[in-house]
Structure formats: C-alpha cells, structure tokens
Amino acid sequence: MQKLKQQVFEANMELPRYGLVTFTWGNVSAIDRERGLVVIKPSGVAYETMKADDMVVVDMSGNVVEGEYRPSSDTATHLELYRRYPSLGGIVHTHSTHATAWAQAGLAIPALGTTHADYFFGDIPCTRGLSKEEVQGEYELNTGKVIIETLGDAEPLHTPGIVVYQHGPFAWGKDAHDAVHNAVVMEEVAKMAWIARSINPQLNHIDSFLMNKHFMRKHGPNAYYGQK
C-alpha cells in the first residue's frame, strides 16, 4: 500500500498548489480494488506538515486498517461512490471558490464552451439539498447517496464531477491524480461560466455538435487527441 499512499499524498499536495483549498478544506482518496482498501487524507491535518505516511488506509466499511490518524470526515462519501461506480479510481472533494459558488447558488455549471466540453459531457450537475433527517443522520453517507441519486446510471467518467447543493464540488477520475486534474478543470470552467454569464446573461449552451466533437476526440472510441 506504500505506493498508493505516496500517490494519494502527492495528489493531496496538488490541491494547495493549484489553489483549490484553503487551510485543510479538501481531501483526495484512491482505491485498491483488488484488496478492497481505500487510502485517504487524514482529517484536519495541515498540508504544510503532512507526509505520505500520514495517509490513512480504510476498508470498504470505513474501518481503519493502517494509520495513526482519523481518516477524512468525508470518508463515507468517498466509499459510497466507490461502491456504486467501479470505474472510479480516485475522488477529490474541495471547497474551491467558483465551483462552490455554483453549489451554494444551487445551480449546475453550464456547458458553455469547448474547454468545458473537453472534459465534461454536458452540464456539471448540482444535487438536491439534503433533508434535515439526512443531515442529522448519516450525513456523509447521505451526501454520497444524493450524488448517486443525481448521477443515476450515467457513466461517471463522462461527467467526472458534481456540485453538492450548499456544500461544494466533488470530482473523480481513473486514479487520484486524474481526479485532481478534473477538479482543477471544474474550478476553471466554473469561473469561466460565471464570467461569461456575467457578460451575457442570455448566453446559450454550447452547440451539441461542437460539444460532441470536443468530448469524443478526447474520450470517444476513435479519440485522436494527444499521443498514443
């Protein structure tokens, strides 16, 4: 697990590097599906002092199997998503400014241009709000459930992120670094959408044929973007 702990540590350290977190407001995890174990950031530990050995290993029920610290308070959300979507290898949660603003506004981040379409096939959805009972019960688990309720049976890697109403963004990917990459992109397109709609409040969504082209040339069966 040491290799995965190092990867998760490095991915967590990318969050302050890209300006996605303030203080300790974020976490990254990754899963070893063969072993059924998840590595995640410890709760409330400052990035300035954090080390790879501080990462916490939990099983799929949330029991700590390795580590001196308590795991992130959002662990139950991560585990619920891993259980539901086998294609996920890494998950990120932040309170990055612009994506969180859309979450607090209760609005999906609209697909307005090709930067968005290169990574997200359509709007980045916003969940419904959690009920009082859901918050006072198993809050973090129910956060995962409301994300799943919103995504349904859609392929999560085609829309590798979501904003949870009145909370903030979650992003995911094939591994921890891919998840962070998608979280960075989500923050950037959230900022672009806010600026674009401020300039032109009547701005329409990107044309579907242009969105399809940009997404499929990177992620489709005949993708040709980048190098083999």
UniProtKB/Swiss-Prot annotation:
Binding annotation for Zn(2+): D74, H93, H95, H167
Cofactor: Zn(2+)
SUPFAM superfamilies named among the record's database cross-references: AraD/HMP-PK domain-like
Gene Ontology CC terms: cytosol
Pathway(s) per entry: Cofactor degradation; L-ascorbate degradation; D-xylulose 5-phosphate from L-ascorbate: step 4/4
Ligand binding (substrate): G26, N27, S43, G44, S72, S73
Enzyme class, UniProt record, top EC level: isomerase
Active site residues per record: D118 (proton donor/acceptor), Y225 (proton donor/acceptor)
Upregulation: Induced by L-ascorbate. Repressed by UlaR.
One Pfam family recorded for the sequence: Aldolase_II
Coiled-coil portions: none
Single biological process term from Gene Ontology: L-ascorbic acid catabolic process
SS bonds (residue pairs): none
Cofactor stoichiometry and binding remark: Binds 1 zinc ion per subunit.
Gene Ontology terms for molecular function: aldehyde-lyase activity; L-ribulose-phosphate 4-epimerase activity; zinc ion binding
UniProt entry keywords in alphabetical sequence: Carbohydrate metabolism, Isomerase, Metal-binding, Zinc
EC number: 5.1.3.4
The reaction(s) this protein catalyses: L-ribulose 5-phosphate = D-xylulose 5-phosphate
Functional description taken from the UniProt entry: Catalyzes the isomerization of L-ribulose 5-phosphate to D-xylulose 5-phosphate. Is involved in the anaerobic L-ascorbate utilization.
Family under the similarity heading: Belongs to the aldolase class II family. AraD/FucA subfamily.
UniProt protein name: L-ribulose-5-phosphate 4-epimerase UlaF
Organism: Escherichia coli O1:K1 / APEC
Species lineage: Bacteria, Pseudomonadati, Pseudomonadota, Gammaproteobacteria, Enterobacterales
This protein's encoding gene: ulaF
